[in-house]
Amino acid sequence: MNLNDDTMAFLKARQEKLGGELIYKSYATWYGRTDGDKRDFGVFVYSDGRTLVLEDFERTPTILGIRYTPKKKSEYKKLEIFIPVEAICAIDRITRSSAEQSVRDGIDKGKAISLFSKLFRKTVTRIALEDGSAYYLEIADTDKLKKTLNK
């Protein structure tokens, strides 16, 4: 992978912030949380093995690649969440509809899904915490995340 200077500087700053090398990096195209927070745009996901970080960035909306300014501009609220890896009790895949219901209802109702469901339904990664809360991410590499964090 060929990374430009801005990307390299960004990753270096994140490593310095965590105090260790980033051993996991991914990008979630959808994000939800049992506290009702939901993002339909990307969230950067990274870890040094001790802490899992979810972070987003303010962006200009586009339609078919063309930037536009919405009439009602909602106030941007930065997402930057630090999750100690020891607080994570499970990482698995659930249906997106189950994740959306959990976000709406404020309680984690997700159950790991079968291979059949993985093939025929839209799925997301569920990160369940010991306190009963959960994060939901649409990422491509759930197995790599589980292996990296030993979950």
Predicted features, each with a name:
Residues L3-N4, M8-A9, K71-K151:
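Acidic, Ser/Thr- and proline-rich intrinsically disordered linker/docking segments
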